Amino acid sequence: MKKFSKLLALLLAACMALALAACGEAPAAESEEPAAVSEEPAAESGAPAEAAEVAPLTVGLLGTAVKPVGVLVADALGYFAEEGVETDFEKVSSMNDAYMAVSTGGLDVYLFSSTAAATFIAQGTTTLRVFGGTVGEGSEIMAAAGTPEITGLEDLLGKTIACQMPETGQMVLKNYIMEQGYTFGAPGEGADITFVYVNDAIPAIEGCVKGEYDYCITNSCLGYYAGQYGAALVGTVKQFVDPYPCCRQTCNEATYEDNFEALVRFEIANLRGYEYYLNNMEETLDILEDYSGEDRDFLQAQLYGTEGYTPVMRVSLDPDKDACVEFYQAMVNIGEVEDTGVDWDQYVVTDVYSTALERLMEREPDNALWQELSEYFAEHNS
């Protein structure tokens, strides 16, 4: 078991930045008096781009996580400069620090976490706007090798699931359990499904292998290494809820209102980077390997898949407003954040992404990708 633990530690060291970026820590936000949230877009979608003033954007990145692949590719290929928006990147030490910086204007944009924004907003912070996506549906369910694949919620009844508290997937699953008329709780509470919080993926996976837990919820494509853990990838949270958000693009309210054009240009470059990622695997992996220092095969597994592994994590820049608002309400439903009467709809804005997409469609009317993304946007953003 010592050898096993050492293997896990070595493998997870390379993935830890990704795991940390998946959902975020539970922040302790500084409350402030709620302010009226504007329902009007910060700029007219049809306004000429050249007529708007564009100020630089300061964008936060966490470690060497590659989830914001569109941004990383766009930066490497000079797309931000081509679109006329100066983008300065800053590394942050923690999710809590990042959201505090965005809420106070120290950062304009942050590209990770879905839970942190909701926690800050529920605690009284009114200066955050979720304007786009980074990835979605990233939570996998692992168990000891030989465990049958999960086919339905009935397979989880009477079982114990280990997870990290900030994990998006565990919150989504708990809300689904409630909706189906079942209960969840801590050990000894007599719930239909028991959840145990652990500090990171190592004790969760080890516990499954030892028989201490029946399942564990992990993220950041750790299922790619399941066989090396003595574990098996037996399901996903996406089987129960699809779509649901993971990392989001979040900005400061003042940036949204006063520097809207810069956000649009940022998103255009981001979308161009996303298109490049879809069509140029080897070149994209070169960029990401140079940026992150991660194992190339694991990078491919995360973002493209391999012969033996299909990632559940979906790279998407779409705000997915409907799913995002539903997730924030789910956090209230399960008691993850206090019900303070927040109108979540007002904090998820879609006009930055839609304006960027409209301009790309005007620029490249025959590009099938922009049409595909436009159709998805119309379906998932009420």
Predicted regions and their residues:
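Short, glycine-/small- and polar/acidic-enriched structural segments
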Residues: 35-40, 45-197, 207, 214-220, ...
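Solvent-exposed, acidic/flexible segments
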Residues: 60, 64, 91, 95, ...
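Short linear loop/turn motifs
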Residues: 88-89, 96, 190-194, 301-308, ...
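Pocket-lining segment of extracytoplasmic ligand-binding domains
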Residues: 115-116, 203-293
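Conserved C-terminal helix/tail region of periplasmic/extracytoplasmic solute-binding proteins
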Residues: 329-382
